[in-house]
Regions:
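Iron-sulfur-associated redox domains of electron-transfer enzymes in respiratory
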Residues: 2-6, 13-84, 211-583
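Residue-level recognition of oxygen-bearing side chains
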Residues: 21, 156, 198
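Cysteine-centered loop/knuckle micro-motif
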Residues: 161, 203, 252
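Structural motif corresponding to the C-terminal cap of alpha-helices
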Residues: 165, 203, 339-343
Length: 583
């Protein structure tokens, strides 16, 4: 039994476990205390002071930071006294004194935690006029822009980057000159940044944001010479709805497809189809390596953030990486080869757009070593869920009112195995569903067989019997957990045959391109689990749940590739990797 502490908050008696903070105690009785720097279990530093409350422990009232101040027996707390209100308002005014206040043109306007608090506390813009250092925009990275003129020094991005074991950003200088930058004052694109975008989704303001590629898409849609096709990743269908007021994890596939068609795309396709294609290639690759005992463990290659992490920090594992392109890359490849041939089109006239929950996909789209057609990129523009939402709103489409629509052929039919790619463990489970039937020759009837790889835990392990042979697998999400697994493999402590790694904690549902959830919600709701529920529900409701049973995938092999792992498939659907320096 936990020792309990009794206190009063705003006159209400509260009993909470010893070690709880005032913030947590207040939350337990329905009192929300505002924060800016606080991220539960990740950035508990009490730096912003927005969470100040008055606490009396028998020595008179004192203003304390509730996010780090522990409760004590008999404590009396006021969360909304006149002194507290004044202190919070003054703190906000001081933050604004050095803040770039171009709110109307800021990408986070309407979804800015600082803006929201300033509105709630009636803060006026020009109470204090502080010295404002002026910073140049850092546009050096392929996926994002850093605008330190809007930074409030909350260090949430630093915590997110450290959590990923990348740690390429931190506090530089002191006093008024303090800024969040890169080691040695390098530009972000000159560091070992892996483009995951976790810093973006954890930033409370507009200091970090994805590079906006929507103008490229608008121009392509307006070009009569271009055939513009779009693919949507699995996690998009459970994220996009949040931008239009739906509950977290709501499946909005039909409305998403309808909106894309209204935007003018010539073909609206499902990346889940390409995920099924990936499984066909990856399962074949795994069985080939497993039977030969070569380059094991096989490690998945669907997450470009993980791939870049491996290239920068663990190049010794490059031989273990699957040579399969990611589903985004595979779709682009088949669009500019098989689809072009089938439709009688010149590949250079096809403009492929990806809607992804991931900022690292922008980096992947720029990789010249991934092209299926010489001189042409597989992907012409990769946009985030947030960018798509802005396009839909800009076009005046009433997302909630439009009728549902279906994906187009020949890349519109997909299995539930492709759907669960968006959740951590999904790629592994999808591959095992196919590998099981290929190896045993038996029908997989119980889909709970591989449930051990589900869930948001950072590292999951399982051993499965495939026709009398044991296969040891591991799943890691978040690069801190990937590091743990890789170090155990290096030391010989663990031996696995197959490893799935996703750069973002929880997988693509928690990607750097997903809708940004304010810390006031994400501190108390498991965003990863809520969005993943939608994907597993979608999988359960689909009539087709195994990649190798997808008739559209079978048609691609029958008409074009021959068989999984063929020479043609390797040329178009597979790739290589490059060792990179850290700085």
């Amino acid at each position: 039994m936990n020792e309990m502490v009794n206190l009063k908050i705003n006159g209400v008696a509260v009993s909470v476990p010893k070690g709880s903070t005032i913030l947590e105690a207040a939350k337990s009785i329905g009192v929300d205390i505002p924060t800016l720097c606080y991220m539960k279990d990740r950035n508990e530093i009490g730096a912003c002071r927005i969470c100040m409350v008055e606490a009396n422990e028998g020595r008179g009232n004192r203003l304390v930071a509730s996010c780090v101040y522990p409760v004590s027996e008999g404590m009396e707390v006021s969360t909304n006294s006149i002194n507290v209100q004044k202190a919070r308002k003054t703190t906000l005014e001081l933050i604004l004194s050095t803040h770039d206040r171009k709110c109307l043109s800021c990408v986070r306007s309407g979804n800015c935690e600082l803006q929201k608090l300033c509105n709630e506390y009636g803060v006026e813009e020009s109470v204090f006029d502080g010295e404002k250092p002026v910073y140049e925009l850092d546009c050096s990275a392929p996926h994002m822009v850093r605008d330190n003129n809007k930074c409030i020094l909350c260090r949430r991005c630093v915590a997110a980057c450290n959590e990923q074991f990348v740690s390429v950003i931190g506090a530089n200088n002191r006093g008024i000159d303090t800024n969040i930058g890169s080691v040695y004052d390098l530009k972000l694109g000159e560091t070992g940044c892996i483009s995951c975008g976790q810093c973006i989704v954890n930033c409370p303001v507009g200091a970090l944001y994805e590079k906006d590629d929507t103008q490229k898409v608008w121009e392509a849609l307006a070009d009569p010479e271009k055939i513009v096709v779009v693919q949507t990743a699995p996690a998009v269908r459970v994220g996009l709805g949040e931008e239009f007021g739906y509950e977290m994890g709501t499946i909005v596939t039909g409305k998403m497809v309808a909106a894309l068609k209204m935007l003018g795309f010539d073909g609206v396709f499902d990346t889940n189809f390409a995920a099924d294609l990936t499984i066909m290639e990856e399962a074949t690759e795994f069985l080939g390596r497993f039977n030969k005992g070569e380059n094991l463990p096989l490690i998945t290659s669907c997450s470009p953030g993980w791939i870049k992490f491996c290239e920068h920090y663990y190049p010794e594992f490059i031989p273990n990486l699957s040579s399969c392109k990611s589903p985004q890359g595979m779709f682009g490849s088949v669009a500019k080869t098989y689809y072009a041939e089938k439709m009688g089109l010149d590949p250079k006239d096809i403009f492929v757009v990806s809607v992804m929950p991931c900022t690292a996909k922008k980096f992947e789209a720029e990789r010249t070593d991934h092209s299926a057609v010489a001189g042409l990129p597989d992907i012409d523009a990769s946009i985030t869920v947030r960018e798509l939402a802005r396009m839909i709103k800009k076009a005046g489409i009433n997302f909630r009112m439009i009728p549902d629509a279906e994906f187009d052929s020949p890349f519109g039919l997909a299995s539930g195995a492709g759907t669960i790619f968006g959740a951590t463990g999904g790629v592994m489970e999808a591959a095992l569903r196919t590998a099981y039937e290929v190896v045993t020759g038996n029908e997989l009837e119980d889909f709970a067989t591989f449930s051990a790889v589900r869930g948001v835990e950072g590292v999951k392990e399982a051993t499965y019997n495939l026709n009398g042979t044991e296969v040891k697998v591991a799943v890691a999400s978040g690069l801190a957990n990937a590091k743990k697994v890789l170090e155990m493999v290096k030391s010989g402590e663990k031996k696995y045959d197959f490893i799935e790694i996703m750069a973002c904690p929880g997988g693509c549902v928690n990607g750097g391109g997903q809708p940004i959830v304010p810390a006031s919600v994400s501190n108390f709701v498991d965003v990863r689990a809520e969005r993943a529920k939608g994907l597993y529900k979608d999988d359960e409701n689909l009539p087709l749940r195994k990649s190798h049973k997808n008739p559209d995938v079978k048609a691609v092999y029958d008409e074009f590739f021959g068989e999984p792992g063929s020479h043609k498939a390797h040329h178009i659907l597979h790739t290589g990797y490059t060792e990179r320096t850290k700085y």
